[in-house]
Design a protein with these regions (language model features):
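Short, well-ordered beta-strand core segments
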Residues: 48-49, 145-147
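Internal, well-ordered alpha/beta segment that forms a basic, Gly-enriched binding/recognition surface
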Residues: 48, 54-56, 74, 78-81
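Canonical P-loop GTPase G-domain recognition
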Residues: 75-114, 118-127, 143-146, 152-169
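Switch II of P-loop NTPase G domains
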Residues: 3-7, 11-16, 21-49, 55-66, ...
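Structural motif
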Residues: 53-54, 151-152
Length: 169
């Protein structure tokens, strides 16, 4: 497939729109091979289905890296963190869960990097630094993903077990 090919299927009176997109290559997120155009379709998807060749399972790493680089977080929940900018009062940090990856100094430093000097920050999830930065960027898509293995008839059972390590949870 060299172009995005749309299709519609009907299931239980629901019309489901499907886009078959070209294979994702290294550098797609930076525009190589019309990659940004192709990956932008995935940003708005309700589900990403990756068809993975069992003879080249390492390709999943390229796909995951390129999706991450363009701001798609497959099979991740959006962090439950609220940042409300305000006019005065400095940065107020509160949390309903223990924060094991962030401390107050790091949070304030990251907030300041984004030019916010007055904000209320509420953590309802224990997030990493990268997840907190994703919250502040506000341009990430959290999309469920399914990985399908293609050509399973060409590998034996032992190899199928080995393939499981390539498939993300």
């Amino acid at each position: 497939t060299l172009d995005i090919v749309p299709g519609v299927m009907e299931h239980k009176n629901a019309k489901i729109q499907i886009f078959d997109i070209p294979g994702i290559i290294t550098g797609a997120s930076s525009g190589k091979g019309r990659g940004r155009e192709i990956l932008s379709v995935a940003r708005t998807a309700d589900l990403i289905v990756v068809v993975l060749d069992t003879l080249n399972p390492q390709h999943i790493n390229v796909i995951l890296d390129e999706l991450h680089n363009i701001g798609i977080r497959p099979n991740q929940q959006q962090p439950d963190v609220t940042v409300k900018p305000k006019k005065l009062g400095g940065v107020n940090i509160s949390s309903t869960v223990p924060l094991t990856h962030l401390d107050e100094k790091t949070i304030r430093s990251i907030i300041n990097e984004y030019g916010m000097h007055n904000a209320d920050v509420l953590f309802r999830d224990d997030v990493t630094i990268d997840q907190f930065i994703d919250v502040l960027d506000r341009n990430k898509s959290y999309v469920p993903m399914i990985v399908l293995l293609n050509k399973v008839d060409l590998v034996d059972k032992a190899d199928l077990e080995e393939l499981k390590k390539y498939i993300p949870e």
